[in-house]
């Protein structure tokens, strides 16, 4: 598995968790969107919309 593919898988897994947090009302959409952008940046991925 290449490093890029590994990072994409990790990012998509974190995106799933963020979407669950949004669905369950754990945090505001604004905070979760910021977290999503930062996760994408740190993994070198293009952010996917919530």
Predicted regions and their residues:
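Acidic, Ser/Pro/Thr-rich low-complexity regulatory regions
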Residues: 1-50
């Amino acid at each position: 598995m290449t490093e890029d593919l590994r990072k994409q898988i990790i990012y998509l897994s974190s995106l799933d968790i963020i979407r669950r947090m949004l669905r369950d009302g754990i945090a505001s959409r604004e905070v979760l969107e910021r977290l999503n952008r930062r996760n994408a940046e740190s993994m070198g991925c293009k952010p996917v919309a919530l």
